[in-house]
Amino acid sequence: ILLIGAVVVIWKYTPGNIVDKASELFNESDGKVVHKKRVVLNVPLINQMDDPKLYNGCEVTSLAMVLNYNGIDVTKSELADNIETVPFQYDNGEHGNPNDGFVGSVSGSTSAGLGVYHGPIYKLAKQYADNVYDLTGSNFDTVVNKVEEGHPVWTITTTAFAPVSDFESWDTPDGKIDVTYSEHSVCITGFDRDKRVIYVNDPYGYKNREVDWNDFAAAYKQMGKQAIYVTK
């Protein structure tokens, strides 16, 4: 990219984080900022399958990573104990709604479970942090910009990190909703604009896992554009 006019190179270093050395280029002639090409935040990895196992606990485990990164000492198990829950299935045959609480069992050790969406996760995060922001509904570029600013982002995706076709319709107390057992939650930790990849801490045990940018953005959209971040 050819920049016309005076250019100021601003180098910001955060211990433990990898940032492209030409991190921000400010073009004084037109006031535009050229975004960082690559960012990888050093977010602590928490594995939902480590003891005590949370077979269905990707959402609370990913939230624990975000909170830990921001200096908040909380475990996945504590979050699992404190997340609002709803039954997997009521006596009348209706299912719980993940917008109201975690559907079923978070641990998955004794009964079925599905997952939970951004609303209950936001409420849970507010119990531990003052500065919690719900980006739900924002386009994916906005999410990436928050990571660029140094904030790991909790989000809902799929186990394929791409759109899926295995949705089914559930009757809930709030009406019909479409759900998928492929629903997954991760912590977005970085990106590479040249390689067109997103980096995530996957609570299945993968730190800074590299996934395709376009596929991940499409899954983000399919799953309702759900995202939350925290600041100190």
Task: Describe each model-derived feature in a short phrase.
Residues 1-119, 159-161, 166-170, 179:
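Active-site-adjacent structural segments surrounding the nucleophilic cysteine of cysteine proteases
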Residues 54, 58-63, 75, 79, ...:
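Stable alpha-helical elements in mature extracytoplasmic
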Residues 54, 151, 182-184, 196:
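Envelope-exposed proteins and targeting segments
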Residues 61-73, 82-89, 124-131, 145-150, ...:
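Structured segments of extracytoplasmic/periplasmic soluble domains
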Residues 63, 82-83, 137-138, 156-160, ...:
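Active-site-proximal beta-strand/loop segments in catalytic clefts of secreted hydrolases
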